[in-house]
């Protein structure tokens, strides 16, 4: 059985680095600039954009002609000079308009600068010292001026040597359009929308009379029940009303846990805590039990970094959801404040998304007795008995800090106020868990939250939303139909050859590493040679819903009933999986997923049919174009076997230390350089990359480009310019500023601009291909460049 609980892959985003800009004289980083130094830097920076500008045009003078070149310069004065240097700034379009800083929020722009700063503030390049303050009189430093220049180069997008990504993608970025209901525009989103349309077409064919098999009939029943909005609105919250009533009536933690047990038994869902399965990373032939509690909705960093607008959006969402399940406006408003406070406390004790991939931090084994001691007022044995799983005293807790924080909050339920907090969570989890299958007000609340918090616009149509639900839960039935219709044997053969070419070069690169001993190299090559390769689709097709009844409305079924049946069927499958052991040929994603992945515990790379098509792969494209696009993805996933997390697993997919102590120390030193390289680089004005959070993905990107650069070097007439241009193009993306703010603290991938630009700056071939020198903004000093694999 190749079934594995599938989760949506995190989306990818974008940033860029300009690490070294022209400077005048011997100005040191951190030092305040003089008027003369500022004018000299701006003159050199603007020459390619405003050829006739002079030093005097930029500096101008005081009455009487005194240039006061040694005088200090403020932030406001520096921006006036910048605008003079570039001859004005273009109006932001497309991505620049979406992600620029909203200067209209500034309340401290001096009257003298209002007119001269109007265009530069409207350009979106000016991030303030707070959400509403520009601090115009603060003295400007070299770093601040360089940031303003970097943002100006991105806005202009006309010089490859100053901003490679923005220039290559100028037209696409300026003309980018985000579809209603989507969070961004990119190759991933665009291809994903195309695949969604194709899957929707397959579904519609079954609905129009083409349903012959039991699986296809389940597709039709489920799809029609989702579309039956009249019945859903008429039913309202009736499916969860008994649980809401029981929550209201509970007077103790024990009575509240009885509600959770009832919810699990009758629907398969949980409210406060639950048991599950995970592949045992120390013995990947078997499963280990999992135990977890509440996870804050906004993640580990979502509360401490939230803007006032984001906090208000989340609290409005919570308030709306609670009123939809019967709470008064006053009670829901108070509860929204409480949820934020408690969520923030749990989040502060939680692991980051990067840490959650670190086996050293997540492989924490507890006994049932230890867990029972954490939750003394909960009968965990009774809760576990409902799962059908076989009990062992080997239970993994992936995030002990988060669980301990939740245990402390849960124990406060022995007080009236503490019990009310738990009741609020129970109501909210019922509303959020079942809401999408109930009346349309729940969906509208979710869409409103997405617009306010993420900056999205519009929503998917009911038909599109229904098709997406179907493809998420019925991939076993839809996957084969999709592959048969849309995936070619030629594409599979071409990609298989490219994978082998990349593996061969990767092997050569490991053999020539100067920081790794021969002992560790042998282990690394053994792991590389053992990588399992999944391309297109699996050899065998699962039917995980075989025993699940998906009843039509005529048979008494509904969207909510169908979801409950699927969840209960999933729980039953977990119990069966525990007995059968782990299938080594697991496919961790659907065949039509527009993504790719590396699975640590299987030492496998997976490239579904969904991503192996334009714009990532095109049978008619040049070798360099395919190498720079789908090749980037392939080599990236291979490198995950050797990133800071993958390096802790051996060739069999078990968490085993195969390094010498000296080699691992050298590897960690290189990882620290990668963190430093990416940390603080902007994805949009005022929004920076977290180098530690994105470390694993950045290692994979660097390894990918290193490998592909070497492959290109072996060709008779290497065309590095075409290769690197393709790389920048495939990561072209646009997001609202609100989405970028969220991704900056949650996504383990660096922003796309960095993935298609900063990574290239580590390779000498990039500089040679585009004649980039230390006089250009794209220049990265050799001592700052990092290549690991």
Question: Each predicted region: which residue ranges?
Answer:
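Feature responds to low-complexity, polar/acidic, surface-exposed segments characteristic
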Residues: 2-115, 127-142, 149-156, 517
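Intrinsically disordered, low-complexity linker/terminal regions across diverse proteins
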Residues: 400, 471, 475, 479-789
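Second-shell loop/turn segments in exported
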Residues: 27-29, 64-69, 104-107, 133-135, ...
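Sec-exported extracytoplasmic/periplasmic mature domains
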Residues: 43-47, 58, 83-91, 121-125, ...
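Noncatalytic, helix-rich "gating/capping" subdomain that lines the substrate-entry/channel surface
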Residues: 203-497, 501
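Short, solvent-exposed loop/turn elements at domain surfaces
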Residues: 47-50, 172-177, 298, 615
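Stable alpha-helical elements in mature extracytoplasmic
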Residues: 34-38, 54-55, 63, 74-82, ...
């Amino acid at each position: 059985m190749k079934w594995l609980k599938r989760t949506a892959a995190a989306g990818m985003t974008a940033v860029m680095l300009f690490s070294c800009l022209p400077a005048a004289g011997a100005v040191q980083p951190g030092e305040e600039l003089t008027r003369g130094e500022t004018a000299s830097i701006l003159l050199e920076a603007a020459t390619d954009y405003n050829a006739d500008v002079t030093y005097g045009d930029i500096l101008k003078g005081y009455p009487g002609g005194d240039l006061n070149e040694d005088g200090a310069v403020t932030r406001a004065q520096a921006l006036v000079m910048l605008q003079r240097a570039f001859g004005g700034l273009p109006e932001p379009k497309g991505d620049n308009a979406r992600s620029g800083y909203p200067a209209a929020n500034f309340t401290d722009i001096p009257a003298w600068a209002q007119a001269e700063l109007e265009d530069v503030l409207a350009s979106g390049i000016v991030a303030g010292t707070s959400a509403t303050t520009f601090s115009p009189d603060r003295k400007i430093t070299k770093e601040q001026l360089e940031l303003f220049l970097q943002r100006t180069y991105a806005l202009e997008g006309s010089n490859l040597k100053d901003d490679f990504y923005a220039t290559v993608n100028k037209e696409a970025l300026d003309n980018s359009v985000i579809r209603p209901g989507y969070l961004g525009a990119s190759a991933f989103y665009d291809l994903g929308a195309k695949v969604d349309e194709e899957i929707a077409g397959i579904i519609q064919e079954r609905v129009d009379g083409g349903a012959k098999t039991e699986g296809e009939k389940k597709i039709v029943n489920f799809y029609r029940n989702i579309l039956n909005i009249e019945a859903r609105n008429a039913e309202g919250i009736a499916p969860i009303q008994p649980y809401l009533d029981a929550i209201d009536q509970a007077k103790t933690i024990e009575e509240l846990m009885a509600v959770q047990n009832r919810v699990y038994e009758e629907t398969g869902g949980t409210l406060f805590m639950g048991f599950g399965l995970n592949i045992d990373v120390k013995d990947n032939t078997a499963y280990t039990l999992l135990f977890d509690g509440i996870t804050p909705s906004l993640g580990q960093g979502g509360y401490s970094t939230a803007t006032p607008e984001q906090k208000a959006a989340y609290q409005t969402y919570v308030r709306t959801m609670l009123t939809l399940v019967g709470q008064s406006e006053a009670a829901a408003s108070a509860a929204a404040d409480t949820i934020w406070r408690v969520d923030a406390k749990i989040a502060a004790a939680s692991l980051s998304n990067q840490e959650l991939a670190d086996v050293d931090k997540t492989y924490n084994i507890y006994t049932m007795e230890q867990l029972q001691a954490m939750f003394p007022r909960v009968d965990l044995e009774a809760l576990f008995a409902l799962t059908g799983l076989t009990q062992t005293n080997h239970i993994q807790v992936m995030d002990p800090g988060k669980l301990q924080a939740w245990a402390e909050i849960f124990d406060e339920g022995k007080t009236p106020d503490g019990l009310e907090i738990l009741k609020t969570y129970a109501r909210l989890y019922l509303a959020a868990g079942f809401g999408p299958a109930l009346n349309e007000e729940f969906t509208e609340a979710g869409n409103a939250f997405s617009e306010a918090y993420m900056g999205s616009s519009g929503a998917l149509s009911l038909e599109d939303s229904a098709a997406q639900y179907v493809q998420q839960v019925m991939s076993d039935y839809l996957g084969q139909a999709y592959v048969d219709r849309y995936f070619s044997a030629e594409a599979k053969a071409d990609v298989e050859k490219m994978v082998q070419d990349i593996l061969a070069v990767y092997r050569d690169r490991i053999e020539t590493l100067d920081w790794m001993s021969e002992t560790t190299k042998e282990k690394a090559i053994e792991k590389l040679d053992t990588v399992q390769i999944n391309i297109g689709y699996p050899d065998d097709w699962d039917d995980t819903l075989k025993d699940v009844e998906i009843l039509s409305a005529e048979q008494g079924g509904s969207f909510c009933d169908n979801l409950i049946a699927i969840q209960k069927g999933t729980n039953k499958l977990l119990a069966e999986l525990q007995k059968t052991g782990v299938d080594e040929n697991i496919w961790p994603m659907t065949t039509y997923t527009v993504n790719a992945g590396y699975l640590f515990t299987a030492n496998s790379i997976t490239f579904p049919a969904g991503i192996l098509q334009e714009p990532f792969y095109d049978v008619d494209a040049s070798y360099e174009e395919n190498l720079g696009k789908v090749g980037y993805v392939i080599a990236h996933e291979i490198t995950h076997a050797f990133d800071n997390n993958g390096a802790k697993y051996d060739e069999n997919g078990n968490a085993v230390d195969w390094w010498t102590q000296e080699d691992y120390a050298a590897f960690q030193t290189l990882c620290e350089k990668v963190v430093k390289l990416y940390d603080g680089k902007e994805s949009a004005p005022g929004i920076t990359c977290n180098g530690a959070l994105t470390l694993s993905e950045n290692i994979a990107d660097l390894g990918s480009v290193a490998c592909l650069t070497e492959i290109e070097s072996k060709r008779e007439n290497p065309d590095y310019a075409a290769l690197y241009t393709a790389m920048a193009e495939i990561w072209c993306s646009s997001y609202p500023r609100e989405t970028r703010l969220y991704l900056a603290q949650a996504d383990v991938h660096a922003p796309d601009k960095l993935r298609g630009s900063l990574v290239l700056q580590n390779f000498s071939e990039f500089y040679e291909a585009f004649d980039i020198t230390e006089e250009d903004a794209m220049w990265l000093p050799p001592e700052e460049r990092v290549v690991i694999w």
